[in-house]
Amino acid sequence: MLLRFFKELYRAAAPAPVTLGTVPFGRQLPVLITHDVDFERSLTNALAYAEFEASVGVRATYFTQVKYVRDFNDVAFFNSNAPPVLQRLRALGHELASHTVSHSKVFARFPLGTGTERYPDYQPFVRTPILTIGGSVLGEMRVSKFLLEQFGGQEVVSFRPGHLQNPYSLPQALMATGYRHSSSVTANDSLTHLPFQLNYDRARTAETPIFEFPVTIEDEAQPPLGQRVQAALDVARELARYGGLMNVLIHPDITGHKLQFERDFVTALKPVAWFGTVNEFATWWAARNEVAADVEYSANFAAVTLTAPRPLNGLALQLPSDWRVQSVQPAGLKLTPSEAGLVIEQVPPSVRLIFRR
């Protein structure tokens, strides 16, 4: 809220306010459809969701538990049936992501581990809801990533812990094991609907390159998800006021009302929202985060210079409504008008835009 307040203050008071949009291609809000595959029947059910998503041009993220140990929680469902499902998800354009090995309710209290954990020697065992034996943070991350990449044929760069258990060592553990993005907390707990950068040990002294993408709505609260379509759309409408992130978590343990919720929700927002995977949005956000903007102005003209160290598509610039483009460098750069300004379709390393005020 404080950052949004300062942004609005800047836009109201600055003589030449220019800000970067928070949604690719100037859409009203970004929507991430994410699934936690952590139950015996969820693997098969995931395909029903995936086929629907592909049919409407939506790519989703499937956070998949690699459960190869039978224990208190469930049978060992990551077996010979899993690889064909993973490969079909990948073929449909979806992202494969890690949801740990054990899905332990006490993952936040696991020791960090050695960084040498590997399959099949790593054998975490959930004995009760509050007791897991043989688990470590690095083991959960290393082994799940290895198996998903081995059988899914896709690099795994996004992570979500079971039960959103969030150990203090998670940011540096993500770095150490090759992940780039996290979706491990709710928006309510983190008090923001925007991505944010994680700090070492979740403290204040050192940033990591990992960004967190908090969960907005999940399917385990009451009333049942199928009865919450309008409530979810109401949240989306509020987030669209400032380009906040809508990260929807749906467990594919059943289809029924959950799948119908997704159908109705996606259909309603498709005309105004940007949909993509966690990796797609996170890659875009990290590139946007490094863009530098410099504004010069006179009585009748303004010049905006952008420096973009990383490849970036669909960057929206929010500009005063009376500005009109006079010239562009490099020549031929494709600009598209948007509701709040304009969109640069493909951002080169350096851009200079001249406007008449």
Question: Can you say where each PLM-predicted feature lies in the sequence?
Answer:
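N-terminal pre-catalytic segment of deacetylase/amide-hydrolase enzymes
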Residues: 1-32
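Catalytic grooves of carbohydrate-active enzymes
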Residues: 150, 210-281
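His/Asp/Glu-enriched short active-site or ligand-binding loop at hydrolase and phosphoryl-transfer sites
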Residues: 175-204, 212-222, 275-285
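Surface-exposed beta-strand/loop patches in extracellular or lumenal glycoproteins
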Residues: 307-324
